[in-house]
Amino acid sequence: MRGKDARWLSFKAIALYLLKALLFAAGAAAAVTFFFSWIAILIGGFFFFGSRGAWRGGGYALALAAALASNGPLRGFDEITGIYPLFLAALVVAVTLGLYFLFLLLHLALGRVKAYRVFTAGLKEKLYRPCRPTLRRRLASILLFLIPVALWISVNVNPAVIFDNLPAVLWVQAPSTVAPGDEFEFQVQCWDRFERISALYGGKVSFSLESYRFPGGEPLYLVEATLPAEYSFTGSGRPSDAAYLLDNGKDNGRRAFRARIDTPGVHYIKVSDSETGRSYYSNPILVAAGTERIYWGDIHTHGIYSDGSGTPAHQFFYARHVAALDFYSLTEHGEIIQLGRNGLERYIEETNRAYRPGEFVTLLGMEYTNHNSGHYTCIFDGDRLPEDPPVYAPYIGLGAALPTPFELWELLDDFTASTGSRALALPHHTVVERFMQDWSYYNPRYVKIAEVTSTHGDNLYEPGHPLSYRGSTFPPPPGTRGCSITGALQMGLQLSLYASSVSHDGHPGHDLAHTGAWVGHQRPFTFWWTRFDKPFPGGLTAVYAAGLSRREIFSALENRRLYAVSDHGRPLIFFTINGTSVGGDSTLRVEGRETPRQIEVILAQDGALTAPVTEFRQPDWKATVEIHKNGTLLASLPVDKPLAAVRFTDTGPVTGTSYGRENCVYREGAYYINEYSDNPVDPAALHTGGKDFYIVRVVSENGRHSYIGPLWVEVAP
């Protein structure tokens, strides 16, 4: 029996040791994650307070590693070091635990030396003598462990995000275009200072109209319309960071109303609020017969199946019912979605289920993530995706799948030919050094539009360019050329401008990462380090389309019938040169190089507050309509009223432009568009073929930017 008992005790000891090792390894893995590193703190505390010797010290090292790993990226060291946040967190954990294990090895090795044993015994005596009473010793342990806890809390917890859900402003959203006499739905939301819906809001609202003749902008005083009666909102008794999920029979800060406007023109619904004592404007509503509709969407976001937050069901609900989008694409990273069991199939199923023709359009999409040549969000107009997603991921052994965009084009060729589906590949965050776009891989069949603005910043010009007013995250070194959209246009690429949120926080169409609500305890949760380093508000894309179906929305994107805005605002913009508007090849052909070009821009500004909504201000409608020609500022035209039509005549010759050999980099016998490119080019081929291109950017004094174009002008043969 004694032998059996000894073997049993030995087995138990080994099993217990293995369980401890597995638990410690789980803690080390948790320490690398965003916010959920608190699990590592708990596991570290378990070892620190429940074990002795090396396990006790290991518990403290684990908790300290988790705290330091959080502080690294969240205090900006990822930007200082240039190390990607996830890799920086992993490096900090590895170094911290590695140093502790190295200390253990040294301790074991030196334990054979008498002088070292005497030294450590004396040191313990000095340290423990003041803490000899049990209670005092326990208090000292607690205080010691509070160091990593406090370090972790300092960057991971924001009490205001937890408790401050107080009403701050109202947001009024309506369709951009309706027919005279048609009843339509509009939404009134109350936001807190983090732009989340305030569950506490209980104000009374009343409705009125402010109307203007279209396109002249003269005020309309006799308007036939039916607006809702006064209404008192019912709020929850407690704050919520996701009020739209509450199911308590109350409004919880969000309600839909119905209205009808019979008089043609541009109209703003004004909502007077008893709680804040202010009036708020809706977006402009164009009431006109026989016009194309304007629909709003977000076509580049990420959720829980890759490196974002929120399930597909949550994403589609938020996009449709909270952000009030007309179309939306959840575009998970191809290499990450493959890691989850059946994730791709579930994503396709959820996307197709959320599609409601005439009400809400979902587009299947997937992101090709190649840090060497740039990212492409691939979207499709059908109900299927390629069986092998677009993947480039050497860090998980998938690098050979599609090593360059050339293989991506082959995959899209095969898929569209075999299914009849159409595809677009959308370049984005083109000027961010980590993901810089290499335009030399351009494919005109799939690359027709490019992301001009998102939570990563502005891509119209390189961040150091004098016409780059907003900048970007992680900009390249000063003087870097050839990564902006303007640079691509100067090379002769045919690209139009769209915007998206690139939401990683589970709020498509209205990303909250530019507010303090990026913290990990803001729902929906995530393990990924992808929502704290995006200080810019997410953008939206508007399309001119005949109807709300996948085919019609996709066709509008493919045919460049679109414009973009830098936040949740929804202005009306119409841009023509000699009567030619955006769409198709967006090209005006003139008789001669000296033919005058009459540029007209009709702008109806959105009266909503711009992001971030930290300070209330009544709209003063001050903005500048900028006309950019071939990458230079041709004209700046001020406006100071809600609806304005501005005109400018360009009498300069049609010359075209080029990227220029001087902007290329010569390396090992070949030219490249910049030092980041690995695909040789012929500098003499980087030109517009004699075409001039024009872009309109609206710069509002409140910080909102809107973009439309380009339109190209060429001399007819």
Show the residue positions of the predicted features.
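Membrane-interfacial interhelical loops
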Residues: 3, 61-91, 116-125
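C-terminal functional module detector
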Residues: 35-36, 40, 75-93, 100-103, ...
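Membrane-helix interface and helix-disruption motif detector
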Residues: 13-17, 24-43, 48-58, 72-91
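Internal/C-terminal transmembrane anchor helices
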Residues: 132-157
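Conserved, mostly hydrophobic/aromatic
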Residues: 300, 362, 452, 557, ...
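Acidic, His- and aromatic-enriched active-site or binding-groove loops in soluble protein domains
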Residues: 353-357, 379-401, 442-460, 517-535, ...
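A metal-dependent hydrolase metal-coordination microenvironment
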Residues: 264-266, 274-275, 279-280, 288-438, ...
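Membrane-interfacial, low-structure loops and terminal tails that flank and connect transmembrane helices
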Residues: 2-10, 111-136
